[in-house]
A protein has these predicted regions:
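Strongly charged
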Residues: 1-92
Length: 92
């Protein structure tokens, strides 16, 4: 499902026009990104938790050039769905 499809379906379900729904969806996504950039966790009851997971520095191989490269330590976004969400998906 694309963002446009999500906006269209949510607009139909709620009766809110698509432009307003698009602004709401983009606002939520932007707020989620900003919170994670500031290293804050985001918890949405009934859906799940967005957190950051730290990845340590590691050595990898560039197989096309047959050389080793260093990958710096970095954080990645991680989503953990809540129990109710997992059960609903498993039951479908």
């Amino acid at each position: 499902m694309t963002k446009n499809e999500l906006v269209r379906i949510a607009s139909q379900k709620t009766g809110i026009d698509q432009q307003t729904m698009l602004a709401a969806v983009e606002g939520i996504v932007d707020t989620l990104k900003e919170a994670l950039i500031e290293k804050e966790n985001v918890f949405i009851r009934g859906w799940g938790t967005w957190t950051l997971k730290h990845r340590a520095k590691k050595t990898a191989r560039n197989i096309s050039k047959n050389t080793t490269i260093e990958i710096a330590a970095h954080d990645i976004p991680y989503f953990k769905p809540c129990k109710e969400f997992l059960e609903a998906v498993a039951a479908s």
